Amino acid sequence: MNNKIKYRIVLDTETCPIDKDFEGVTPSNMWVYDCGWAVVDRNGNVYKTRSFVNADIFLNEKIAMNSAYYQNKIPKYWDEIKSGERILTSFAKIRKALLEDIAKFKVTEIYAHNMRFDYGTLNTTQRWLTKSKYRYFFPKSIIICDTLKMSRQVIANKKKYIDFCKENNYLTARGTPRLTAEILYRFISGNQDFTEEHTGLADVMIEKEILKYCFKQHKKMNRELYAKA
């Protein structure tokens, strides 16, 4: 570990609905079954990766798992668990591993793309499994950051990005550029054929590139999910 490097964690989750009949996608109705992260620096260099499958949900909540948005990937998960690419373990042990990485690399900031969703679903899962004995997944000391929020500030208004979205019809109903991780990565990488995998660690690998691109703009950004009081 290099004390001159400011290490950050980029994290992503995949979820299944608690109540499949509930309309809309809201963090309070989601359980985390896949959690992956990478320890990175602002230049996108990767120092450690983790890829976990939450056994408490993946094994014990089969009805919910059968309603997961990417349930067709379940056989892939089993193959990767057997090969050792993913670790099947309890949610408590996933959190323990995160705390270990935070301590080892002296991490003070954790990022996700649309962190509001990941933050909410991790807390929902934590509260469900501990019967609200423990209510928050991330330590209180961690600064919670959002690359979607950053992208709105330093990418969305770039003429090059606006033109890119217009040319490829990546626009919202209001005619503004969309800022999904998949579209942003297509813009950054120049790979129009890229399709997001929608598994935890794989998505982290594109989200850390979004983080890198935002930092490369050398502009003042409000990175934190929630504004300070």
Where are these regions (language model features)?
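Conserved non-catalytic scaffold segment of RNase H-like nuclease domains
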Residues: 2-125
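Active-site catalytic microenvironments for nucleophilic, acid-base chemistry
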Residues: 125-132, 153, 157, 187-188, ...
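Acidic, Mg2+-coordinating catalytic module of metal-dependent nucleases/exonucleases
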Residues: 109-116, 120-121, 164-229
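Substrate-recognition/cap helix-loop segment adjacent to the acidic, metal-dependent catalytic center
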Residues: 116-145
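Short alpha-helix plus adjacent loop in nuclease-associated cores
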Residues: 145-172
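Short, polar/flexible loop-turn hinges at active-site or ligand-entry regions and domain interfaces
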Residues: 80-87, 132-138, 191-196
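Ser/Thr-centric signal marking residues that sit
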Residues: 13-16, 147, 207
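A short, structured active-site edge motif that brings together acidic residues
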Residues: 52-55, 137-155
